[in-house]
A protein has these predicted regions:
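Extracellular/periplasmic bilobal clamshell ligand-binding domains
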Residues: 48-49, 54, 60, 65-68, ...
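Bilobed periplasmic-binding protein-like "clamshell/Venus-flytrap" ligand-binding domains
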Residues: 6-9, 52-86
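Short, solvent-exposed loop/beta-turn-alpha elements that line the ligand-binding surface or hinge
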Residues: 1, 19-46, 77-108
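Solvent-exposed, acidic/flexible segments
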Residues: 14, 33-41, 52-59
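Pocket-flanking alpha-helical
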Residues: 1-26, 48, 66-67
Length: 108
């Protein structure tokens, strides 16, 4: 559509900044804002190496480009809060933010 600004969200699938940053590559199917910058794409491509130091350096460069272009404005990060009795056992929380109680039990 024809718009100046929109809101979008993403829950990280895995624990790496590339999970968020790759959303803004030109050909990413989830690049809803249609952001395109060859310099950004090149930094993301250069981050796909085994050397973690180079990986994070290139991702930081990509992030700097994204912020300089104001292609995204991070405004919030999801948090979960949970109060649980120490006697409740067997529950777990997924990286997607879901709480699983089906294996829960009370330990007396």
């Amino acid at each position: 559509g024809d718009y100046d600004v929109s809101r979008n969200g993403w829950v990280m699938d895995y624990n790496d900044p590339s999970n968020m940053l790759e959303l803004f590559t030109t050909n990413n199917g989830n690049n809803d804002g249609k952001y395109a910058n060859p310099e950004f794409d090149a930094a993301i491509d250069a981050s796909k190496v085994a050397d973690k130091s180079v990986h994070f350096q290139k991702l930081h460069e990509a992030e700097d480009i994204l912020m300089k272009d104001a292609a995204a404005i991070p405004v919030a990060y999801y948090n979960d809060f949970w109060l649980q009795s120490p006697t409740l056992k067997g529950t777990w929380h997924s990286p997607y933010g879901y709480w699983y109680l089906q294996y829960g039990y009370i330990e007396e």
